[in-house]
Regions:
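Extracellular interaction modules
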Residues: 95-96, 174-178, 339-340, 352
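Extracytoplasmic, non-cytosolic globular domains
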Residues: 184-187
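Feature responds to low-complexity, polar/acidic, surface-exposed segments characteristic
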Residues: 1-34, 43-97, 106-126, 133-175, ...
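Solvent-exposed hydroxyl-ligand-binding patches built from regularly spaced Ser/Thr
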Residues: 229-377
Length: 377
């Protein structure tokens, strides 16, 4: 019975979101990171091959160069690029020559040494992250994304930009698949862009590239009144300012919009549109999931919180209905409980807004209130 109820609940939840995908790949059933693949396909960055996306295949270095060129220039301009002058193992007639040379010229890639690029080699999350950071505006030399300490410096900026969000099981040093690359690119679209007043110069000491004389990277900003596209994907307001960060997706795709919504159970969801056409609506992944009554203190610990959250910043829904003002602050060691047996509890934590949403779904058919002895008639 429990298995049956779980299957029914899963079916109902999946039907609560209607997704119109632009990525009509024949192997779409194999795609786990559907939101990322759909959005990046809709804007023309991914196109697949022979009608397939091949989500589990490792991303190669030359494929990554093509993705970045498509992202920054658009397909038509990127396909018009010519190359073959930067690396000895990327001939002018190789399909990826234009993309590779473009990325090398703009500082997105630097090769593997000895004048080579290794175009068919695989790519780690850290290496692809460095490419995306340059797309966001970070200067590779100024930020130390080259040289002996490039991995440490790249990892720090990737964490700040949340480039691995949704890829909790992926280590930065691991080779990434095509769908994982799509997820990283989706995260980049939602990350703020940066700029420099001056970039300065660099010196190399014991293999470490050190930037000198340059200014620090600052967020590219705009006011809502000056740039309405700032509301399309992100709207992070700077402290004590009327300025808002401009995310990469807003910079590159003015018709791409991201709106927060919810499904029938009031689970937070994301709706993407392009030129007013819906790409899809996707339920957010909960930060925590429980199937029994859970102490507030446990949730506090499992979220890794260091400060409490006021009950005023907590919202609770039960079977899609607002449950009223939440009764408890989210504090360390609290023994107050939320959820219960037979209740699926999803916890959504917004670390930027410092809010928590509890979504509870009753998975039982009925509740036994009394038991009677068996009788015969």
């Amino acid at each position: 019975m429990k298995k049956l109820l779980a299957l029914v609940l899963a079916l109902v939840m999946s039907m609560s979101l209607v997704t119109i995908s632009n990525a009509a790949y024949s192997d779409k059933a194999d795609i786990d990171l559907k939101e990322a693949v759909d959005v990046l396909s809709a804007v023309g960055v991914f196109e697949g091959s022979d009608g397939k996306f091949d989500p589990k295949a490792n991303l190669t270095r030359e494929q990554a160069a093509k993705l970045v060129a498509y992202l920054q220039l658009g397909q038509k301009s990127a396909d018009a690029l010519v190359g073959g002058n930067k690396f000895t193992d990327v001939a002018a007639n190789r399909w990826s020559a234009g993309y590779v040379d473009y990325c090398a010229t703009t500082g997105v890639v630097a090769g593997i040494g000895n004048g080579q690029f290794n175009p068919t080699g695989s790519l780690t999350a850290l290496q692809f992250g460095k490419m995306l950071l340059v797309c966001l505006g970070y200067d590779a030399d100024s930020e130390g994304l080259t040289g002996a300490d490039w991995q440490i410096n790249t990892s720090k900026l990737m964490t700040s930009a949340k480039l691995l969000k949704g890829l909790d099981s992926v280590k930065a040093t691991e080779v990434i698949t095509r769908e994982q690359a799509a997820q990283m690119m989706l995260n980049a679209l939602k990350a703020p862009t940066v700029e420099y007043d001056t970039k300065g110069s660099t010196i190399t000491i014991n293999g470490a590239v050190i930037g000198i004389g340059g200014s620090k990277a600052t967020y590219v900003t705009a006011t809502v009144a000056e740039d309405s596209t700032v509301k399309n994907i992100g709207k992070t307001q700077l402290t004590n300012s009327n300025e808002y960060t401009v995310e990469l997706g807003e910079k590159l795709f003015s018709n791409l919009k991201l709106n927060s919504t919810a499904d029938a159970f009031m689970r937070p969801a994301t709706k993407w549109t392009l030129k007013a056409e819906t790409i899809g609506t996707y339920a957010d992944t909960p930060d925590l999931t429980y199937t029994a009554g859970t102490k507030i203190g446990t949730i506090y610990s499992d979220l890794g919180l260091s400060d409490g959250i006021s009950k005023k910043n907590v919202t609770e829904y039960v079977d899609g209905v607002y449950a009223g003002a939440f009764a408890y602050d989210i504090v360390k060691g609290s023994k107050d409980k939320v959820g219960g047996n037979g209740v699926l509890l999803n916890v959504y934590y917004d670390d930027d807004a410092e809010t928590i949403t509890f979504v509870e779904v009753n998975t039982y058919i009925g509740k036994v209130t009394a038991a009677y002895p068996d009788t015969t008639t």
